[in-house]
């Protein structure tokens, strides 16, 4: 009779758990009225306008026009979500339904939305989960100067100024005579956002294939976008400079924050959350000790390092105020530092509740240069 070897040699194979899939932050959703997609299906993903035509869209549909601009971006976006809006449905209700149906898209582009719709969507985007941005196009000339619209007694500011006054960080507005021009901007952003080394970007001064530049005065551009010295109403325009350069200005959200900063901070937050969750689910337990907390700090360090490699985080001097032992004027050689409060200082209530001591992630962004002043000194 042959006896089993496992009483002498017992081998257990432990297969490492899979990490959660990282959201790409590289897909926009176009929301329009065409009926090629039913409200029951609600959202479909496309890789080309040809696929949209095969699915029942026509070249006359606004979704097709916007998608053509999106896929024409020089950065080569690979995917676009298209959402359905019911005939009697509000843009807000449709956007919420699209988000419930599909959580992977990042930027919402409503087609032919009125100012009232944009205001509702902008408010929703500020708190939507997962993180969401709103990008819209307006051809309303009242956005080009400090004017109000409407009847006397019911006058309102133009949409750029109204969203700026609300300090909305998740709304990107573009003035353009080209229908759905903002789709071209988001096509560039979603295609460029690969997460690879040195892939960080800014939207300022980018060329937008398919979008016609608007004939605006310097005063109008300054009112909308501002410049290195003055603030505008934080809109965006596409203009020609010096008969040679067709450029987008300035790449800002309604509160003045640059688009790329909002995008990368959303991505960093997502990476940290998933990295820590992967750690918690892959270990028998994380002890409430300094080594245990250090294991959490280690995965956060790894997450931050990805954004050093992409070019969003870079070495620099910290001027963000005192955080534990970090003081203003300290050089962050890595571009970031992760600090935690001592386990010994933890309250008994937090320890009993199995809460980790507070952890602080301090980063220095690489920033970007949009304006240059040059002095030419000549000696005869």
What name fits each language-model region?
Residues 1-380:
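Surface-exposed assembly/interface segments
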């Amino acid at each position: 009779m042959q006896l089993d070897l496992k009483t002498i040699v017992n081998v257990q194979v432990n297969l490492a758990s899979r990490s959660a899939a990282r959201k790409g932050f590289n897909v926009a959703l176009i929301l329009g009225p065409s009926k090629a997609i039913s409200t029951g299906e609600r959202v479909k993903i496309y890789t080309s306008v040809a696929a949209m035509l095969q699915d029942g869209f026509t070249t006359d549909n606004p979704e097709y026009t916007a998608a053509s601009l999106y896929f024409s971006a020089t950065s080569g976006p690979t995917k676009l979500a298209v959402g359905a809006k019911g005939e009697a449905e509000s843009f807000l209700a449709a956007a919420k339904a699209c988000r419930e149906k599909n959580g992977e898209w990042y930027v919402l582009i409503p087609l032919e939305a009125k100012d009232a719709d944009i205001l509702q969507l902008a408010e929703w985007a500020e708190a939507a989960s997962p993180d969401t941005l709103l990008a819209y196009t307006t051809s309303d000339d009242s956005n080009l100067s400090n004017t109000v619209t409407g009847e006397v007694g019911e006058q309102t500011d133009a949409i750029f100024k109204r969203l700026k006054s609300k300090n909305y960080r998740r709304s990107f507005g573009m003035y353009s005579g080209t229908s759905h021009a903002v789709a071209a901007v988001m096509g560039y952003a979603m295609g460029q956002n690969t997460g690879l080394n040195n892939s960080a970007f800014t939207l300022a001064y980018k060329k937008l294939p398919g979008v016609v530049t608007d004939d605006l005065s310097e005063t109008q551009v300054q009112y909308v976008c501002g410049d290195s010295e003055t603030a505008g109403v934080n809109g965006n325009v596409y203009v020609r400079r010096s008969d040679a350069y067709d450029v987008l200005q300035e790449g800002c959200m309604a509160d003045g924050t640059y688009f790329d900063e909002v995008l990368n901070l959303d991505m960093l937050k997502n990476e940290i959350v998933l990295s820590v969750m992967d750690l918690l689910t892959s270990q028998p337990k994380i002890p409430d000790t300094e080594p245990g907390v250090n294991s959490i700090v280690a995965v956060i360090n790894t997450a931050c390092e990805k954004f050093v490699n992409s070019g969003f985080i870079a070495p620099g001097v910290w001027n963000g105020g005192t955080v534990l032992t970090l003081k203003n004027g300290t050089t962050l050689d890595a571009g970031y530092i992760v600090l935690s409060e001592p386990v010994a200082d933890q309250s008994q209530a937090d320890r009993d509740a199995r809460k980790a001591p507070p952890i602080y992630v301090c980063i220095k962004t690489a920033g970007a240069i949009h304006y240059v002043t040059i002095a030419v000194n000549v000696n005869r």
